[in-house]
């Protein structure tokens, strides 16, 4: 019969402890690597440029030919036009505005779409799909997509890229958060929309 001494038992316990710590560290490193990989995948899918300032706006997010931001004024749209901009997509309800944006945009010689997305209601998938289809219809011309603060515009970006690239829910939310989505309630609406599926 094999007899273990106190020193042997202590040595075994120390070895077990060291091995457990090693496995725990490996698990944490693996989880961190997976997170970095996930972030890298999202980053590789689209290249997001932060333009600061942009006309009279503090910042605008650019993804290829698309610009996403809060409410622009005439000077901002003039700057957009100077960059070759041709189209403006407004996601605000007309009742939110105290001026005629359609008239202002047309006076600048730009095309105009208005797809109202009420800020306090669930996001209507049909409206978001219509926005995505309009972006596709316009082709490669520079397009300025906006709402009041940029949150709804970031949701529109997520929907468009999900249709175009087949993003996962996590990828779509991540890209939105890096493109102006800061409001917690709007984030919840985006997740609910993606879970339900993009059906008209």
Model-derived segments and spans:
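Cys-dependent protein tyrosine phosphatase-like superfamily
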Residues: 19, 29-143, 158-200
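Bacterial N-terminal signal peptides that target proteins for export
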Residues: 3-17
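A phosphate-binding catalytic loop at a beta-strand-loop-alpha-helix junction
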Residues: 143-155
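Hydrophobic alpha-helical segments, especially transmembrane helices
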Residues: 11-12, 29, 153
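Short alpha-helical segments used as structural interaction elements across diverse proteins
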Residues: 7-8, 25, 149
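Bacterial N-terminal signal peptides
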Residues: 15-25
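Helix-centric, low-specificity signal for extended rod-like, repetitive segments
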Residues: 3-4, 21, 145
């Amino acid at each position: 019969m094999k007899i273990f001494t106190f020193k042997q038992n202590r040595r075994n316990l120390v070895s077990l402890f060291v091995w457990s710590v090693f496995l725990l560290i490996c698990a944490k490193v693996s989880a961190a690597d997976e997170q970095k990989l996930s972030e890298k995948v999202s980053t590789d899918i689209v290249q997001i440029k932060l333009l600061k300032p942009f006309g009279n706006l503090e910042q605008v997010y650019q993804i290829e030919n698309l610009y996403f931001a809060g409410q622009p004024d005439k000077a901002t749209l003039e700057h957009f036009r100077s960059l070759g901009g041709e189209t403006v997509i407004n996601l605000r309800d007309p009742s939110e505005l105290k001026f005629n944006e359609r008239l202002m945009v047309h006076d600048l010689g730009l095309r105009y779409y208005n797809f109202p997305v009420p800020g306090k209601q669930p996001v209507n998938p049909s409206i978001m799909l219509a926005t995505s289809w309009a972006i596709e219809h316009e082709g490669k011309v520079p397009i300025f997509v906006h709402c009041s603060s940029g949150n709804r515009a970031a949701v529109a970006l997520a929907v468009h890229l999900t249709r175009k690239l087949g993003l996962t829910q996590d990828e779509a939310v991540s890209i939105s958060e890096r493109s102006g989505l800061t409001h917690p309630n709007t984030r919840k609406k985006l997740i609910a929309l993606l879970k339900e599926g993009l059906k008209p």
